[in-house]
Each structure stands twice: as C-alpha cells, then as structure tokens.
Swiss-Prot record:
Lineage: Bacteria, Pseudomonadati, Pseudomonadota, Gammaproteobacteria, Pasteurellales
Full protein name: Membrane-bound lytic murein transglycosylase C
GO biological process: cell wall macromolecule catabolic process; cell wall organization; peptidoglycan metabolic process
Gene encoding the protein: mltC
Source organism per UniProt: Haemophilus influenzae (strain PittEE)
Principal location listed in the UniProt entry: membrane
Keyword Membrane assigned: yes
Length: 357
C-alpha cells in the first residue's frame, strides 16, 4: 500500500504553484514539508488499509473532498469533477444517516478542518453544497430538517451494498449533483475574483479558468505538494513569492490559504508576478497569457527553457513568433506532459467563461 500511495501522490507533486523564482533554494523547506507529509500519509494509509483493505484508498485531493468519520469506518466522497457524492459506511445505517446530513450541510470554511482525522465536519447554516444538490422532491437542501428527511429517503430507497476484498460489507448511497454544479460554485466566488482581477489587472476569465482547472472550485482542495485551496497555492514557493512582493516575511500558513479571500488574492498576486516580473519582456499579450498559464503550473523558468536556455534569448524568440506558434510549442514541446495538458485545459476553460460573461 505504501508504494501504491506514493504512486498516487506523484501527480500532485508538481501542482500549480511551482514557483519560477530564480536563485532561491526551497529544497530544505520542501524536504521538511514532505517528511511531515510522509508521516501523516503513512499513518492515514495504515488506518485505511486496516479498515477498508487494499485498493480502497480514498484521499482528499484537488477536486475530491474525502472525509472519514466514525474512527475511519464511514467516509464521504464528493467528486467536484464528476459531480457525484458517495457516502458509505461499514457500520449501521444510523451512522450513514449522520454522515449524509453532515456532508450535505458542511460549510465552505475549510480552516481548522482536518481531512485526515476521523471527526465530523460541523453543520453550517450556510451549506457549501446549497444549490448544487437537490433532494428527492427537487428542493434545495438548506437546513437540517430537509437534510435529515433526504437522508432517511436515501437509506430507505437508494441504499446499496458491496463487499470489500477483506470481506467487510459496505452500505452506501450515491447522490448526483445538478448539471451546472460547477457554475454554481464559481458564482460563489465571483465577488472575490472580480475584486482581485481589478486590483491586479488580471483578466477575470483567466482567474476562473485557472481556478476550475486547479480545484474545480473546491475550497477544501489540497495536493500532496501541499498546494492549498481554490487556486492551489504552495506556501513555500508561490506563497513566499507573494509575501515578498507584499513586503511580508516568511510564507502563508495553511490556515491563511484556506481562507478563500486570502487564497484568491495570493493566486492572482502570483499571476501578477508572472505577468509583470518573470515574463515581463514578452510583448504580445496573447503570447504572454499562454506563457503565464503554463508558468502557473510548471514555473516561468521551465516555460522559458522550452524556447532557449538563456532567459533573454527565450523572450526574444517568443517575441518573434505569432501567439499561435507559442501556444503550439508550449502544448507540444514542453518536457512536462502535465504542463502541456494544463495550458490546453485552462485555455479551454477560460474561453468558456468568456462566453458566459
């Protein structure tokens, strides 16, 4: 399982906030973070192995909310990408009922919520999933009475069972989210996005496109590079760059970055750094946008090295090209397949948000 877990974590190690800051060595900070993470994930995977068996690891990530409760015998999984909620337990249906209610009524505030512990997430008077899920009568799930009635309906009418490889029996329910759940989540953050866009001079649709690609507007998002929140900011790289730009010392805390206001401000600040510092010499705005998107994922240094090992020569070559050429090169010649796909995804998402405005 340990080998499986490490393989599962590898795609996240290059999440969006690999800072392009030249000349600053973050190896020591990264080593400390990953050592602590190794201990945490080792303990966590041991619990899941013991209770659920092999090949049953589910863990919170950028676009997946996963919360274990009841000493890890019950879990809730919200796939913000697929738009589906699965809640399952190895205990009695009362525990399933409790988990359904708490999941449907969880708040949007991820600060202080330990996704690797086994306690319940508090019920909120302003549920994050409000407007994204409806009950069996088509009504919004706005309070505990509606959520409890829906949970009872699901257990009485939609309960399913499956058997794990370790012989344990699991009871579960599956709840689809509404068709436009992504748009509903995006709208929750539009005021903050517009404020940051105006403050830093960054296109609103670009912020939306990056946020959808990074987290699918999941406020609980986390990667195993310790990228945090809606815009997946890594504290010791992009976060440190942003704090330096703002005249602050150190780096943002996890709690700081789980605040949507802080997270969006930090992510958009980092885009400003890419636009006005690391990639400042690129003259065509469309070419610069393509470079910024790719750099948000892989770092400005990696982007420029696609064109030339010398920074000034790389910028000169970019400026001799049409934007379409820059796009083609970054989506075909970048050594990172993740970075190649990232530009494709963000550009597509940005176009979608431009149309909807």
């Amino acid at each position: 399982m340990k080998k499986y877990l490490l393989l599962a974590l590898l795609p996240f190690l290059y999440a969006c906030s690999n800072s392009p800051n030249q000349g600053i060595n973050y190896d020591e900070a990264f080593a400390k973070d990953t050592q602590g993470l190794d201990i945490l994930t080792g303990q966590f995977s041991h619990n899941i192995d013991r209770i659920w068996g092999v090949n049953e690891l589910l863990v919170a990530s950028r676009k997946d909310y996963v919360k274990y409760t009841d000493s890890f015998y019950t879990r809730s999984h919200v796939s913000f990408d697929e738009g589906n909620i699965v809640i399952e337990t190895q205990q009695d249906p009362n525990r399933l009922h409790n988990a359904i209610v708490h999941t449907l009524l969880m708040g949007a505030d991820a600060k202080g919520i330990d996704l690797f512990a086994s306690g319940d997430v508090p019920i909120s008077s302003r549920p994050f999933l409000l407007g994204q899920v409806v009950d069996h009568q088509g009504q919004q799930i706005a309070n505990q009475v509606i959520a409890s009635n829906f949970a009872t309906y699901l257990i009485q009418n939609k309960l399913q069972t499956r058997r794990l490889q370790n012989g344990h029996t699991v009871q579960f329910v599956s709840v689809p989210m509404i068709a436009n759940h992504v748009e509903v989540r995006a709208r929750k953050y539009l005021p903050l996005i517009r404020k940051a866009a105006q403050r830093y001079g960054i296109d609103e649709s670009l912020i939306l496109g990056i946020m959808q690609t990074e987290s699918s507007f999941n406020p609980y998002a986390i990667s195993y590079a310790n990228a945090i929140g809606l815009m997946q900011v890594v504290p010791h790289t992009a976060g440190r760059d942003v704090f330096t730009m703002k005249g602050k010392g150190g780096q943002p805390s996890t709690r700081y970055l789980y605040d949507p206001t802080n997270n969006i401000d930090a992510g958009v600040s980092y885009l400003w750094i890419l636009q006005n510092q690391y990639l400042d010499g690129i003259t065509n705005p469309t070419s610069k946008r393509f470079a910024m998107i790719s750099a948000y994922n892989s770092g400005a240094g990696a982007v420029l090295r696609v064109f030339d090992n010398d920074k000034d020569m790389a910028i000169y070559k970019i400026n001799q090209m049409y934007p379409e050429q820059v796009y083609r090169i970054l989506t075909t010649a970048h050594p990172s397949s993740q970075a190649r796909n990232y530009l494709l995804k963000v550009d597509k998402a940005q176009k979608k948000f431009r149309v909807r405005r």
